[in-house]
């Protein structure tokens, strides 16, 4: 069984743990840097990206997270987690983890009161996934090797690049665990490649 960490500094941690377990993997809430060595994949949960960055800096997680990304182990960022994974953020001089060749606009769908749900078609997942968007970012631009898995209107809301997956929406806030299960499969495949 693969072990998937959920960065436990801030955000929808419990909901991700429940979704990982429902997808047949072991979930570990990561609150200490050394726990990164014990896991096969990592989820960066949605929350408030500025607060999350402050906590990542406070607990010296940034370099270990960048090292984890360089190791080739899969990472999945939802909402604020997508912002953390992006190489370019509109209106900001530097990236956070910067593992994905994507450009992201923060709070692009509006403020908290503009939050909404939308039916999405997600490549490799299904036609009828309900995406929960809360002050959501979206992907403005992608490198050639980034696969766009889903759009809402003309906006890219789910993307994949190598071992990295990012979504504007919160798949953990529904009882539909297919997006998490998709990530669990990515982690299983990556672990098998390391064994071979």
Swiss-Prot record:
GO terms for cellular component: cytosol; glutaminase complex. Its EC number is 4.3.3.6, 3.5.1.2. InterPro entries: Class_I_gatase-like, PdxT/SNO, PdxT/SNO_CS. It comes from the Bacteria. L-glutamine binds at residues 47-49, 106, 134-135. CDD domains: GATase1_PB (cd01749). It catalyses: aldehydo-D-ribose 5-phosphate + D-glyceraldehyde 3-phosphate + L-glutamine = pyridoxal 5'-phosphate + L-glutamate + phosphate + 3 H2O + H(+); L-glutamine + H2O = L-glutamate + NH4(+). GO terms for biological process: glutamine catabolic process; pyridoxal phosphate biosynthetic process; pyridoxine metabolic process. Pfam families: SNO (PF01174). One of its GO terms (molecular function) is pyridoxal 5'-phosphate synthase (glutamine hydrolysing) activity. The active site is at 79 (nucleophile), 170 (charge relay system), 172 (charge relay system). Keywords: Glutamine amidotransferase, Hydrolase, Lyase, Pyridoxal phosphate. Pathway: Cofactor biosynthesis; pyridoxal 5'-phosphate biosynthesis. SUPFAM superfamilies: Class I glutamine amidotransferase-like. Catalyzes the hydrolysis of glutamine to glutamate and ammonia as part of the biosynthesis of pyridoxal 5'-phosphate. The resulting ammonia molecule is channeled to the active site of PdxS. In the presence of PdxS, forms a dodecamer of heterodimers. Only shows activity in the heterodimer. HAMAP family: PdxT. Belongs to the glutaminase PdxT/SNO family. This is Pyridoxal 5'-phosphate synthase subunit PdxT. It comes from Bacillus anthracis.
